[in-house]
């Protein structure tokens, strides 16, 4: 039977069937195995098991046979499933398959999975954890920041959780206080809140109200608790008993409880003004309180964990209570706008109610009443074996209503109703097909998840045709049963109406344009129609969608075709903007690349939806209407615009789509402003449209063409122009723009004219708008040049003549050849001065300009972010700085050294990849921009550094890891690393000082084998070090204590893991050793050393957080850190290694003389009898008089970081090893793999000091020092243990990891040959040496070098000496650093239990941002202003090539300086964002701020016009001050008497000020006057220039060098400009887009984006990083003088111009074709 069930036949069995059968037998779930047994015993139809056939094939006992076929001769699957679960031993196959240890191809307990580890320490089963994981990742993926934090979780659980309890509930889950809930915390919290015993559930509630986590509810916390409990209780369905309950009654009950708790009847300390509860009192009050206020909250949290977090109910009756309780609570709340409710057909709801309400006497949950549930442990499991397999299994088993109906009909035919006796059948997936109508567009993709069209022919009634459930409850039912057709509906609030549920949203058809056939023959319609995605949520909810293929543009204009692409449902209150944004997110489009059109059903035309803020109802869009989604082409053209052009030119119509405007209230009331008309994009012509729009809004030029004055000045004979074509086409387009009533026009004729006369702008590519503008102004000027015949002129050399004469001469010659309105408005004059550095000769030249091209500052800096990882295990710190791109990594080290005070030669700069050190960057390498923000710098150990150290945690390794992990220091540091990272930097100095003052002494810098004497004192009076004596006494418990497993604890072990003999040792120890004990004394030392209770201070070597380097004791000997020999070393054999410090003291660190090294196995230690106070006194009294005393060097502190004195010798880098984190996971393909497990790397590699003579235990201690912050600490006591934090008691006696020797890849062994398939030989935690002098010497010149090498001393690790020859060892001294990593690496193999339960992955890449990060980032993107660019433009620069000096008669070095001599009325500023760098054009994204009003370019004028303006302003201010002085002379008199400085100010004024003494006046006037006189007292320094000496500025004889036509009241010497237009370029160089902003004649600002034109605020927000062209107009400019006088003039003969028009029309018609 088994062979046949697996697919075997007489001809054999296929491999696929055999494999599936083995997987089912070994890995199948209980439900799958039950279904497998059903298929073995059922009939051929697979519907029933016949009693006669079953008894014949299976030898059943009478009892089992009667229990199975008691009601009928045949049973269905549901009946068989219930029976076989209860009688697993009924048959041989069921006993074999359904037992816990059935068949296993590999032992699951060799490497426990994450599920097994969590199941072992929580009240959850492995399947529960798997279900929670699915929901956890779904929630995490929907979060915006990828984390389940309070901001994300709040809207999901509140309501029903009260808002004032939201933070407390979140903190109860967030045990490590990192601000988000990880999966382990979720499982532990759900276990404690739902599956734990009543005591644990109550303790979880206590954590909700204990906000400060001090174990006591303060008065405020107690009042908050009462408010929450009352609010939840009154929302409960059984709220009658809580209806009249008030806050005062609860407080009274608490006071009575406190009185009962008082010993001997003494008065309670609790009062109404001071009500507080301890954790014990809280739990007793919840049990003894008659109010039972805690039960509603417990029920709410119980429901929350099932509904929101994804926990499955343990039985169907529990499911009924959860669903009904959640639904009743939600129904009592009013509708909220935006809330989604889901429709469920009433038939399915009834079947579910019957299934879940059916109770039996066998279910323990059903036997409990509401009053009993508070006293009975709610973690009991229903004996009915509620089927909780996945939704996919439901489908594969073909269960549901169909099976139930078949069973009923069969039973009815035999006269026995099986359904009546076995109970209702589990309902199948939710099927709402009877609520909706048939979809006529079944083959069209739906973008929204509305589910379908509800029936309208028959009215649907709630509670009769359908039921409504909230979104959260629907998701839970969907997880448990599945669904075929969700029907979400949204709550809306129409204007002037109440909220309502919108059952019938608008179902719209979305049309797209059919792609024009390309050369490949693939149309866009097929591609768009083939998109597929899974839609989740309701209509309007985001869903994943495909991309969009850009529509190709045919070279022949023709109307685009439309086709039905999608359907979507939207609320009738949705706005056009919301619809557009939804479609963009669904189809991955940009909002600026789409437009929406309404296509009426009986009309082929389209109406553009311009009103973004109007809703669909206001736009008269009805159900089943059509919306056209227009997608802009790749060349930035709009298909509808091109189609309208084709239609118009072919005679089919004369209007554009924009002509049709919907007559809405806003469109009727709005007036189409003149000039507010867009321009069609004719194929990447945005550069032309933007330039034209700003010229159209240049008011004097616009008036010139609007009045048709150009027709009197067209110069068709000018060969340098376009024969008047451009001027005529430009005028026609300008007139059309300013008089059009349509929203956009097509600049076709002007485009053809530009292509003809400027072929460089032809084609479909993108061009530079500035280049077009410059050509356009020049071509318009030539077409309108009033000079018919240009005279010949030759520009003379300045030859030392005054600038005024040379400039007038140059402008006169230019004006004689060029006279037009373009010259009058846009042209100015630049002064160019070249100074010879050899003789000082100056050559001045004046040239006209139409726009100023200002180069942007190009900074050749690279921004670096470097993460510094220290050896002390502190939180890494990230630094930021900027370096020149030509620098090397040696400069980076020195720059970083100034920030973190870490010596450059103690830095290892490297790049990480895949949790490994990919490459070490040498000092002489040039900086790379690719890894600028991903650099890691490790602190290298000093040559004398020891490894077992951590003063911050006071780590005494002999004390045992259990007590270390429970120490308050570790708990505090672990919490502070998450909750106080923002203050870590500022408090680092205080922490360093505090630790240094605790009396810890660092080790001594000693080389060789030596012994340190006990009489040690300090020789530096300023030293903070005081030697201490650390003692430790064990409690003697050790291994002598044997704890008996309690009965309930044994049941927990049996429930979680089955039989004990199958459990792994570590997990069994955790389950059995539940009572904490201290570690045995000999855990980390040998027996002889264990008898010694005193521990020397020199054994415990400390480093401080953020320490750059310290002096460490260098040990050697058999037991380097456990040696207790006390024979002193002669002080004469020590050599001083540190010089005198600046305070007069001396750092007397000594080293042993190399000549005295005898190679003896001797240790050294400090005496254990020194007193701290005596040592301090001796150090202060005998500072300089004890030359034979030994002390440690004291590093100075600065902001918590040690800084070295300049007098100290350079630090020498020591040897080190690289360690990588590794976890062992079960191999997925265990059938084919040689190994059952596979290693994988994770986290950030470590750098482990490996000094000479170090032991394996030193390696373990050094690793523990750096990884201890990544583990969640064990609670200090068992009373403080949380629900699942104390994961494994066995970890207290050992490190939670194992070190192994591997290769650089971290996966294979570095010792064994590849054929052994070894994953790395274990490095045991003992006192064997790691190194024995086999390493080559460290190259002093290289700072990033190390040569790790291991010499094994135990049999399990072979000796590495056989692999190394002397030649090979010597060569390693000169091998690059990366070579060393290829030989030997340490793999940190984490214990699976510790990795799963205590390792905090969020801390792996946690760092603290140094203040330099913000400073450097700000400097990197620091903006500049327009003045900065103008200063750079007018500053003097040295010429790269030598200049031919006319005076020296040869080439000489020279400088050049540009300045503005004459300002134009319209000043165009060009910001040069496009530059050629190394042969490639790049765009600068530099932020340039520019003024809108009162832009004064005076500082950038040449000296003569600049001094003229400044002197005029100065005299004007003096005149104003004099007038004010005359009016308030009395005030001046009083001020002179009071304030002496005012007298000095008055004496310095010139005589023409006319200041006299005056009487007193009110104080405000006197203050203003005094400030004004003080300001003017400091006379302006007049400009000094050779030009001013030749052209002096005479007061009263000022000359206006700009000659602007201004209005009468405007000062001609106040050249202030206002911004009226901007051209912006967004995107990259080759694929960007131009838009323009302009202010029209009324002062309103408009944004012109091709055919789109919209009004914006008065001062538009323009991206300063995209501004490209700035247009300024002189304030007070009078337009009339610039316009020619045409009175009495006749039009010239322009007969030749219309001929060109006909030619243009002909070219245009060639593009039209009728398809």
From Swiss-Prot:
Protein name stated in the entry: Ubiquitin carboxyl-terminal hydrolase 32
Binding site for Ca(2+) 1: 174, 176, 178, 180, 185
PROSITE patterns: DUSP, EF_HAND_1, EF_HAND_2, USP_1, USP_2, USP_3
Catalytic residues as annotated in Swiss-Prot or TrEMBL: 686 (nucleophile), 1633 (proton acceptor)
CDD domains according to UniProt: EFh (cd00051)
A GO CC term assigned to this protein in UniProt: Golgi apparatus
Free-text function comment from the UniProt entry: Deubiquitinating enzyme that acts as an inhibitor of mitophagy probably by counteracting the action of park. Possibly functions by hydrolyzing ubiquitin attached by park on target proteins, thereby reducing park's ability to drive mitophagy.
Stretches assigned to the EF-hand domain: 161-196, 197-232
Biased composition (Basic and acidic residues): 1540-1549
Source species: Drosophila melanogaster
Coiled coil: none
S-S pairs: none
Class of the enzyme per the UniProt entry, highest EC level: hydrolase
């Amino acid at each position: 039977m088994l062979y046949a069930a697996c697919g075997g036949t007489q001809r054999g069995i296929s491999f696929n069937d055999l494999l599936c059968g083995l997987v089912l037998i070994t890995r199948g779930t209980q439900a799958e195995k039950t279904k497998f047994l059903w298929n073995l015993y059922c009939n051929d139809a697979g519907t029933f098991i016949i009693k006669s056939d079953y008894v014949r094939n299976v030898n059943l006992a009478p009892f089992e046979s009667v229990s199975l076929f008691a009601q009928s001769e045949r049973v269905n699957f549901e009946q068989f499933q219930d029976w076989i679960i209860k009688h697993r031993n009924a048959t041989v196959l069921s006993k074999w398959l359904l037992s816990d240890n059935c068949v296993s191809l590999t032992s699951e307990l060799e490497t426990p999975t994450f599920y097994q580890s969590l199941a072992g320490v929580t009240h959850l089963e492995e399947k529960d954890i798997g279900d929670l994981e699915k929901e956890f990742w779904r929630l995490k993926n929907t979060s915006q920041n990828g984390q389940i934090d309070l901001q994300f979780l709040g809207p999901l659980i509140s309501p029903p959780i009260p808002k004032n309890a939201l933070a407390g509930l979140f903190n109860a889950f967030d045990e490590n206080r990192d601000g988000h809930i990880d999966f382990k915390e979720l499982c532990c919290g759900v276990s404690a809140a739902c599956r734990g015993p009543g005591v644990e559930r109550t303790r979880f509630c206590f954590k909700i109200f204990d906000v400060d986590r001090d174990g006591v509810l303060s008065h405020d916390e107690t009042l908050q608790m009462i408010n929450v409990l009352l609010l939840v209780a009154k929302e409960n369905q059984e709220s009658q008993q809580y209806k009249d309950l008030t806050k005062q009654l609860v407080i009274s009950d608490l006071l009575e409880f406190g009185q009962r708790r008082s010993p001997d009847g003494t008065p309670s300390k609790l009062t109404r003004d001071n009500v507080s509860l301890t954790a014990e009192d809280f739990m007793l009050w919840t049990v003894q309180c008659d109010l039972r206020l805690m039960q509603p909250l417990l029920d709410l949290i119980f429901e929350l964990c099932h509904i929101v977090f994804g926990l499955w109910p343990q039985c169907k009756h529990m499911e009924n209570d959860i669903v009904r309780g959640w639904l009743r609570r939600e129904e009592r709340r009013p509708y909220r706008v935006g809330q989604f409710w889901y429709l469920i057909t009433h038939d399915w709801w009834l079947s579910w109610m019957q299934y879940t309400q059916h109770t039996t006497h066998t279910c323990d949950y059903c036997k409990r009443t509401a009053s009993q549930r508070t006293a009975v442990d709610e973690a009991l499991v229903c004996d009915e074996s509620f089927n909780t397999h996945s939704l996919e299994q439901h489908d594969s088993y073909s269960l549901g209503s169909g099976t139930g109906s078949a069973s009923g009909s069969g039973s009815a035919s035999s006269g026995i109703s099986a359904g009546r006796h076995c109970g209702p059948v589990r309902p199948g997936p939710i099927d709402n097909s009877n609520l909706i109508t048939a979809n006529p567009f079944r083959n069209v993709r739906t973008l929204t998840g509305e589910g379908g069209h509800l029936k309208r022919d028959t009215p649907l009634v709630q509670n009769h045709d359908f039921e409504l459930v909230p979104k959260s409850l629907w998701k839970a039912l969907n997880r448990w049963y599945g669904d075929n057709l969700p029907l979400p509906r949204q709550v809306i609030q129409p204007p002037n109406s109440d909220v309502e549920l919108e059952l019938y949203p608008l179902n719209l058809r979305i049309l797209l344009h059919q792609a024009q056939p390309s050369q490949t023959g693939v149309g866009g319609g097929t591609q768009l129609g083939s998109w597929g995605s899974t839609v989740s949520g309701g209509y309007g909810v985001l869903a994943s969608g495909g991309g969009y293929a850009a529509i190709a543009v045919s070279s022949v204009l023709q109307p685009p075709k439309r086709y039905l692409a999608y359907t979507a449902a939207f609320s009738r209150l949705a706005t056009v903007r919301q619809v557009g944004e939804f479609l963009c997110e669904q189809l991955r489009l940009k909002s600026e690349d789409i437009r929406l059109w309404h296509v009426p059903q009986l009309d082929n035309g389209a109406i553009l939806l311009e009103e973004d803020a109007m809703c669909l109802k206001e736009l008269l869009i009805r159900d089943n209407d059509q919306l056209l989604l227009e997608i802009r082409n790749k060349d930035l053209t709009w298909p509808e615009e091109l189609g309208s052009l084709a239609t118009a030119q072919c005679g089919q119509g004369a209007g554009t789509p924009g002509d049709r405007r919907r007559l809405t209230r806003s469109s009727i009331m709005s007036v189409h402003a003149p000039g507010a008309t867009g321009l069609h994009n004719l194929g990447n012509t945005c550069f032309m449209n933007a330039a034209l729009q700003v010229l159209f809004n240049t008011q004097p030029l616009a008036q010139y063409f609007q009045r048709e004055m150009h027709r009197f000045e067209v110069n068709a004979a000018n060969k340098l122009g376009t024969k008047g074509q451009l001027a005529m086409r430009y005028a026609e387009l300008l007139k059309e723009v300013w008089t059009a009533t349509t929203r956009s026009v097509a600049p076709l004729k002007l485009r053809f004219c530009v292509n003809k006369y400027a072929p460089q702008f032809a084609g479909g590519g993108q061009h530079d708008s500035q280049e077009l503008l410059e050509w356009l102004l020049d071509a318009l000027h030539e077409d309108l040049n009033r000079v018919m015949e240009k005279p010949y002129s030759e520009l003379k050399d300045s030859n030392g003549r005054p600038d005024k004469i040379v400039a007038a001469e140059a402008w006169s010659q230019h004006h004689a050849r060029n006279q037009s309105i373009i010259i009058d408005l846009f042209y100015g004059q630049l002064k160019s001065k070249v100074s010879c550095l050899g003789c000082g000769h100056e050559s001045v030249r004046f040239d006209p300009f139409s726009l100023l091209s200002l180069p942007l500052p190009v900074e050749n800096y690279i921004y670096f972010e470097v993460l510094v990882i220290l050896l002390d295990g502190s939180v890494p710190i990230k630094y930021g700085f900027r370096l020149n791109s030509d620098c090397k990594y040696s400069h980076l080290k020195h720059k970083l050294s100034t920030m973190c005070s870490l010596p450059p030669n103690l830095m290892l700069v490297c790049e990480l990849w895949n949790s490994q050190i990919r490459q070490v960057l040498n000092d002489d390498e040039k900086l790379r921009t690719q890894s600028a923000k991903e650099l890691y710098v490790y602190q290298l150990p000093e040559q004398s550094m020891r490894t077992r150290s951590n003063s911050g945690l006071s780590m005494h390794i002999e004390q045992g890891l259990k007590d270390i992990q429970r120490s308050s220091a570790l708990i505090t540091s672990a919490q502070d690393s998450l909750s106080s990272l923002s203050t870590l930097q500022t408090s680092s100095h205080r922490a360093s000082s505090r630790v240094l003052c605790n009396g810890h002494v660092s080790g001594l810098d000693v080389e060789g084998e030596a012994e340190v004497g006990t009489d040690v004192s300090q020789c530096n009076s300023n030293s903070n070090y005081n030697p201490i004596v650390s003692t430790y006494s064990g409690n003697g418990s050790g291994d002598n204590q044997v704890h008996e497993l309690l009965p309930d604890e044994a049941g927990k072990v049996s429930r979680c893991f089955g039989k004990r003999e199958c459990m792994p040792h570590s997990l069994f120890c955790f389950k059995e050793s539940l009572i904490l004990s201290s570690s045995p004394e000999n855990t980390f030392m040998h027996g002889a050393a264990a008898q010694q209770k005193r521990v020397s201070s020199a054994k415990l070597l400390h480093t401080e957080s953020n320490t750059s380097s310290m002096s460490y004791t260098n040990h050697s000997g058999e037991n380097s850190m456990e040696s207790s020999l006390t024979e002193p070393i002669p002080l004469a054999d020590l050599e001083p290694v540190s010089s005198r410090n600046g305070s007069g003291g001396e750092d007397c660190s000594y080293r042993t003389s190399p000549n005295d090294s005898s190679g003896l196995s001797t240790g050294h230690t400090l005496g254990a009898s020194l007193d701290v106070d005596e040592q301090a006194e001796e150090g202060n009294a005998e500072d300089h008089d004890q030359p034979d005393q030994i002390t440690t060097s004291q590093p100075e502190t600065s902001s918590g970081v040690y800084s070295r004195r300049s007098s100290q010798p350079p630090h020498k880098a020591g040897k080190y090893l690289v360690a990588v984190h590794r976890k062992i996971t079960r191999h997925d393909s265990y059938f084919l793999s040689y190994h059952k497990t596979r290693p994988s790397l994770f986290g950030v590699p470590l750098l482990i000091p490996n000094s000479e003579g170090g032991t394996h235990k030193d390696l373990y201690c050094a690793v523990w020092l750096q990884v201890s912050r990544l583990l969640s600490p064990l609670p200090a006591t068992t009373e403080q243990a949380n629900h699942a934090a104390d994961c494994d008691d066995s970890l207290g006696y050992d490190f939670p990891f194992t070190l192994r020797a591997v290769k650089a890849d971290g996966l294979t062994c570095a010792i064994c040959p590849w054929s052994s398939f070894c994953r790395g030989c274990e490095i045991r935690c003992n006192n064997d040496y790691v190194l024995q002098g086999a390493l080559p010497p460290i190259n002093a010149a290289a700072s990033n070098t190390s040569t790790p090498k291991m010499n094994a001393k135990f049999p399990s690790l072979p000796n590495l000496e056989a692999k190394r020859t002397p030649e090979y060892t010597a060569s390693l001294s000169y091998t690059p650093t990366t070579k060393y990593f290829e030989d030997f690496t340490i793999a940190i193999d984490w214990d699976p239990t510790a990795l799963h339960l205590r390792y905090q992955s969020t801390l792996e890449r946690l760092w603290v941002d140094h203040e330099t990060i913000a400073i450097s980032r700000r400097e990197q993107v620091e903006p500049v202003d327009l003045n900065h660019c103008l200063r750079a433009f007018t500053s003097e620069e040295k010429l790269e090539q030598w200049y031919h000096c006319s005076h020296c008669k040869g080439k000489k070095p020279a400088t050049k300086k540009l300045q503005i001599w004459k300002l134009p009325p319209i000043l165009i500023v060009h910001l040069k964002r496009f530059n050629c760098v190394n042969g490639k054009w790049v765009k600068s994204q530099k932020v340039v701020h520019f003024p809108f009003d009162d832009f004064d370019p005076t500082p950038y004028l040449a000296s003569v016009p600049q001094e003229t303006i400044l002197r005029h302003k100065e005299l004007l201010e003096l005149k104003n001050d004099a007038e004010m002085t005359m009016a308030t002379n009395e005030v001046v008199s009083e001020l002179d008497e009071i304030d002496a400085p005012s007298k000095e100010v008055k004496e310095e004024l010139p005589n023409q000020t006319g200041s006299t003494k005056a009487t007193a006046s009110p104080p405000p006037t006197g203050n203003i006057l005094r400030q004004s006189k003080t300001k003017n007292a400091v006379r302006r320094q007049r400009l000094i220039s050779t030009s001013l000496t030749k052209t002096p500025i005479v007061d009263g004889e000022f000359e206006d060098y700009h000659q602007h036509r201004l209005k009468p009241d405007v000062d001609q010497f106040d050249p202030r400009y206002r911004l009226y237009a901007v051209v912006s370029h967004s995107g990259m160089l080759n694929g960007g887009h131009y838009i323009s902003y302009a202010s029209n004649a009324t002062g309103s600002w408009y944004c012109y984006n091709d055919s789109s034109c919209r009004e914006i605020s008065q001062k538009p927000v323009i991206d300063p990083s995209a501004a490209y062209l700035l247009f300024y107009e002189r304030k007070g400019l009078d337009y009339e003088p610039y316009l020619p006088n045409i009175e009495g003039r006749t039009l010239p003969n322009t007969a030749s111009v219309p001929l060109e028009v006909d030619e243009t029309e002909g070219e245009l018609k060639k593009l039209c074709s009728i398809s």
